[in-house]
From Swiss-Prot:
Post-translation changes: Phosphorylated on both serine and threonine residues. Small t antigen inhibits the dephosphorylation by the AC form of PP2A. O-Glycosylated near the C-terminal region.
EC top class named in words: isomerase
The protein, known as: Large T antigen
Residues carrying Phosphoserine: S110
Binding site for Zn(2+): C311, C314, H322, H326
Modified residues (N-acetylmethionine): M1
Lineage: Viruses, Monodnaviria, Shotokuvirae, Cossaviricota, Papovaviricetes
E.C. number: 5.6.2.4
Amino acid sequence: MDYTLTREESKLLMELLGLPMEQYGNFPLMRKAFLQKCKIMHPDKGGDEQTAKMLISLYKKLESEVKSLNTDDGFSTEEIPTYGSAEWEQWWQTFNEDFDLFCHETFTVSDDEEEGGEKRKHSDEEEPSCSQATPPKKKKTSSAPKDMPELLRNFLSNAILSNKTLTCFLVYTTLEKSSLLYSKLSEKFKPTFISRHKLDNEGLIFLITPSKHRVSAITNFCSNLCSVSFLIVKAVIKEYSCYCALCVEPFVLVVENIPGGLNSDFFDAPQEASKNVSWKLIGEYALSIMCDDLFLLLGLYKEFAVNPSTCSKCDQKVIVDHYKYHSLHYANAMLFTDCKNQKAICQQAVDGVLAFRRVQTAQLTRKQLLAKRFEYHFNKLEQVFSAKSEVCIETYMAGVCWFECLLPEVNMKNFILQYLECVVQNVPKKRFWCFTGPVNTGKTTLAAALLDLCGGKSLNVNMPFDKLNFELGVAIDQFTVVFEDVKGQSENKNLPTGQGISNLDNLRDYLDGAVKVNLEKKHLNKKTQIFPPGIVTANEYIFPLTLKVRFCKIIKFIYQQHLFKSLKKTELLTKHRVLQSGLTLLLLLVFHCDVEDFLSELHPLVTKWRENINHEVSWSRYLEMKENVMNGLNILEKQQDSGIFTQTQDTECQQ
């Protein structure tokens, strides 16, 4: 091999391979280095082409020369005789004559050795005699405690694999390891309080964190530092009692981060506040305003902690949900602000609202549910038209005039009554209306007003079908729904395409309402119910026949320039979203319908608001606003009085 390459070529090759000359001839190592250098020196990898060529040529030359030198050392399998023959025995002896495996050494027999060396046994646990051997890993002592000291068990949680989060923990380990864990826990969790205690040769760490954690989080952090030492971590449920027990014999306090330790006030104040606050009172408030938003309820109730005598919202008397209940809940709100479980209290109150709504859905008829909704709207009118409100009845009556001009040759009063009858009767396969037409023709505006009038939710089905489950789950316990702006295929290239219509075609059981369907929300069990009726709004898309037959009525909207102009000039309607409010349609019904058309329990409210409308808006003023809509003018603009009409006419005789 020394004659395969010259001395200079050998040095150059080893230099290119990045290996010392002592490794020359170590072909496995040289080949590994060669493959690595080829990747580095390849021109495509940014290497030098000439250097790469030099490396490859030298290595190939060495490899070819070495193979040629070793050609005589091998043999062919064809030279081996048949196994078992006399020729094979002779060949086998010749083949092995250079391999002498016999050991010629002699050993002196010791007196301690047993006769027959084959009986000697070596223990697996015998320590190596060589001083350079790796020391064996220490094993955890079998005498390690399996549980917390008995004196402390009454103060600790016995839960196993619990996901509950807490702020107080007790760590039990060796005395030596407790010193390390004390410093590491202080760095990691920035505890409100931490102390280290001693029990014989064992250590305990009492830990209070500023935020809540699972027991597993503390255990996983500490176990990375305890490969040999035993470790037990448990949550503390009686914090002050546990701390006091750790400070008396047989325990010894070693160190704590707060000089003087803790007193009972540190633990008892939040507990006393949570005990004294009335959960029932908060639940009743949420039910009275029908608030199913956890964070809204939390914010509203915190506002009650302000003294009612200095509360600006109570002085203004604009928000009924505030000034009506402030004085009653002031004392309870003061205790509520000191609680650490505010979210849990509000969550229970919100759950009570959802439970009440579900009971109503299960027990009341749809006509009774609609009456409850109308009663809610009548009460809301009191708040909307309060003395300090920016809008008045005339503003909403302007919205009534705009709606009456929305669909030519259609009586809007009869239109709304037919829709109410449709959703109340809820007849299978005759439950959905479809609003279709060009862009900006009022489809969504009317659908939103009807949805607010009856109550319900708007749904988006323009998404992949496998993601619709939770979107449809929004309809749980709702009176009506609106499938808003459903997209599909259209001959109009200006309209975006979508899969909403295809998804609706696959939801026939939902639209028909003949059988119950499964609806689901996150973190809640599936609920089986009849899917609520409602409206589908869409632009000029192509509806398949299988979907058309599931609409009991299809209304085609047309673009009317005077509606667009009048709405643009009457900014008050868009600013306060008058046209999207169910209150506008309710006033339309009160204005045009007889009192007997409503349920008997609503008659006093209907009579009251008919009188209010007649007092605020005369019949002549109503006709004037309607004429402004048809002319594309500001609806609330008053024309010059000609002196012809001098008296206010009652609307009861009209229609």
